[in-house]
């Protein structure tokens, strides 16, 4: 709770390691607070973090920079779903998600238009704006960024009992796997796209760029400025596969602030 964050007795030379998941950390609130108080902190600043948290704004930035991202439309909280929109005649499978939220909460995969309204209503519980996105339902990849370098890309193999890499597959399942990518050309393409996407949002130091595929098409799904940071999380795992242990990773992130 940021309201309980008492900074009066904190030395001005203190460096804050930002690892707050969800609201407060991933939406830029804690970064904004620390900046205004004159404290240094790890990772991206308030503006960059806010851009990545807002999926609609982030997609607009990606499109402006000629970076592929799944086609989408938006629906505001009090707006009704219009199935006559041309979008629904072009695309037949969708992901419905809150425009501002994380951890795949409120996200649904929809294969039948009859289920779309229910999915939109679920997403509205988490955000005032909802995205209906073209389903890129094939492979999922992720690339961690550390001090301007793309680390070893990973392929995410969700629990087969889940229809996609949802909250259960991320946090509750023991069957989700993260594996190295054998195709080196693909790995290099993902690295290049990740760097371009990361810096198109003016991000800094470290983060993670997630990808989805549909056939031969690779698209940026989202950019995470405060990704999970347990030893089993994707960024530490990518670092380990790149020859950087957990303690070294922490040190490199902090040293970039000093």
Language-model features, listed with the residues they occupy:
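Active-site "cap" helix and flanking loop/linker of ATP-utilizing ligase/carboxylase catalytic domains
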Residues: 155-207, 237-258
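Conserved metal-phosphate-binding beta-hairpin within the catalytic cores
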Residues: 134, 143, 198-231, 239
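Hydrophobic beta-strand scaffold residues
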Residues: 40-41, 69, 94, 246
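Phosphate-binding site of ATP-dependent enzymes
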Residues: 111-189, 213, 218-219
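A glycine- and small-aliphatic-rich helix-loop capping segment at beta-alpha/alpha-beta transitions
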Residues: 32-41, 112-117, 242
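Active-site nucleotide/adenylate-binding loops and adjacent lid/helix of ATP-dependent enzymes
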Residues: 9-10, 51-133, 137-139
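ATP-binding N-terminal substructure of ATP-dependent carboxylate-amine bond-forming enzymes
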Residues: 1-47, 51-53, 57, 76-84, ...
